[in-house]
Amino acid sequence: MPLSDVEIISRITHRQRPKRLVITPIISTRQFQPSSFDLRIGSDFKVIRNVRQPYFNPLVSQNVILKQVKHYLMPITVREFQGVVIHPGEFALGCTLEYIRLPADIAAVLEGKSTWGRLGLKIHSTAGFVDPGFSGRLTFEIENGGNIPIVLLPGLRVAQLCFQWCDEPSARLYGATGADSKYQYQLETTASRFFKDSELNFFRRKRQAALAGRLQIPEDVMRNLLTELYEEFL
């Protein structure tokens, strides 16, 4: 069930720190909507360079992937009233101006603002859910799906966060040990950290064994690998 504006404010001002919802800075009370909170875009972005990259392979080493990601994305900081231009078909990363921390009994869903969506601007591709326990600034996955360039200015309200009650407080919060959380405490626009997925080491070992001829590849290889994966992380 979504939190109303009254419930959102009540949790922001809660006396008990573990139950407190943190959103800072709150520049205007206009950011409070009937059952959501408007988020502003910050000043740092990462835009795609015009480079040739064959593919991103999660099985290569982390150092190789880091070099590829840095080569692929160019960080820029936008000054006030200058803005960044998102051309038709372009993709960029941005982040919220606000720092957010969710308590154990509140999750959140990130959505774009209809005003910008009607111009073709998408604020997130897949990362729309925020787990209880998350702390940091949310990253936007920005894409211009229209046919006219759009200028984004730091401080504009481009997204909204809808908060939802958990029937029971989460036992393992985002950022907890073993939770495989890759973006806890991020304070700037953060590129993909897919290479830090804990399960990838399992697949890397199997790949090395296969290349060395120590691993037989049966017809039901995927079933066998998934069975081993389940047993390893059980």
Give a label for each model feature:
Residues 1-234:
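DUTPase catalytic domain/fold
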